[in-house]
Amino acid sequence: MQQIHRLERKLLRATAEAIRDFDLVSQGDRIMVAVSGGKDSYTLLHLLMRLRERAPIDFDLVAVNLDQGQPGFPAQVVEDHLRSVGVPYRMLQRDTYSVVRRLVPEGKTTCPVCSRLRRGVLYNAAVEMGCTKIALGHHRDDLVETLLLSALYSGALKSMPPKLRSRDGRNVVVRPLCYAAEEDVAAFAEAMRFPIVPCDLCGSQPNLRRKRVKRLLAELSAEHPAVKGNLLHALAHVVPSHLLDRDLHRQLADATGRDPWLDAEDEEAEDCGEPSAGDGVVSLGGARGGR
């Protein structure tokens, strides 16, 4: 029980800080919490329910689970949990599984197509239900893994934003767990004995690139525990004058009337690839950056 309280406090602090930093929840919001049956979404729902009890503003939560027609999906397990915690909920059924199997060649990962179809269903449901925001359970590790995936395999410096508006302009998506470490989320979900639904019911091949990046981060973290926290910190501390983005450079030059590259400090002599004296666990606001 003591472990549960310790983990809950830690996760509540990280979630509350993200909500404050990025204005993720507003007075009168009706927030759809997408609950897949995994550790992340169960934890997100629990934390938002706890924060709602003590928040200085009023907002509503409604949990939504989508049965995509995957063989053996235990929708009743998820529904029983939602009923037991006393949150308003809605169970959706859309056979996107057969669409995915038709579109994706055998042996290829179905996750990207499946995710897009699922997101579309949730977007439409949110509008129908009058929800002002959709909360997803992506955590810190998802953000830093996506940062490396984008840089290494797509040649772009980008990750998952804490808040975004959908392309059609109808929905706002928020990620309140963006400061929370996956290991804390996993430990909390296990301690709470959430009824976890396996994520491989579809039989899809795993995303090998993401698995490789996750392995790389684990190896680096074993040598330097602050690696993941530092990567998250980097997402919030961009130094445009030390990047090669000409469009960004032009925007800054137009806004300031100065050439950002000529204003850049010469740090090359210090950059030997080794930790500096100040290296270690950094924080993003008040959230710890190490674990």
Curated annotation (Swiss-Prot):
It is found in: Cytoplasm. A motif (PP-loop motif) lies at residues 36-41. Its EC number is 2.8.1.-. Binds 1 [4Fe-4S] cluster per subunit. The cluster is chelated by three Cys residues, the fourth Fe has a free coordination site that may bind a sulfur atom transferred from the persulfide of IscS. One of its GO terms (molecular function) is 4 iron, 4 sulfur cluster binding. It catalyses: cytidine(32) in tRNA + S-sulfanyl-L-cysteinyl-[cysteine desulfurase] + AH2 + ATP = 2-thiocytidine(32) in tRNA + L-cysteinyl-[cysteine desulfurase] + A + AMP + diphosphate + H(+). Residues 262-273 have a biased composition (Acidic residues). Gene3D superfamilies: HUPs. Keywords: 4Fe-4S, ATP-binding, Cytoplasm, Iron, Iron-sulfur, Magnesium, Metal-binding, Nucleotide-binding, RNA-binding, Transferase, tRNA processing, tRNA-binding. [4Fe-4S] cluster binds at residues 111, 114, 202. PANTHER family: AMINOTRAN_5 DOMAIN-CONTAINING PROTEIN, SULFURTRANSFERASE-RELATED. The thiolation reaction likely consists of two steps: a first activation step by ATP to form an adenylated intermediate of the target base of tRNA, and a second nucleophilic substitution step of the sulfur (S) atom supplied by the hydrosulfide attached to the Fe-S cluster. Belongs to the TtcA family. Homodimer. Catalyzes the ATP-dependent 2-thiolation of cytidine in position 32 of tRNA, to form 2-thiocytidine (s(2)C32). The sulfur atoms are provided by the cysteine/cysteine desulfurase (IscS) system. This is tRNA-cytidine(32) 2-sulfurtransferase. It comes from Anaeromyxobacter sp. (strain K).
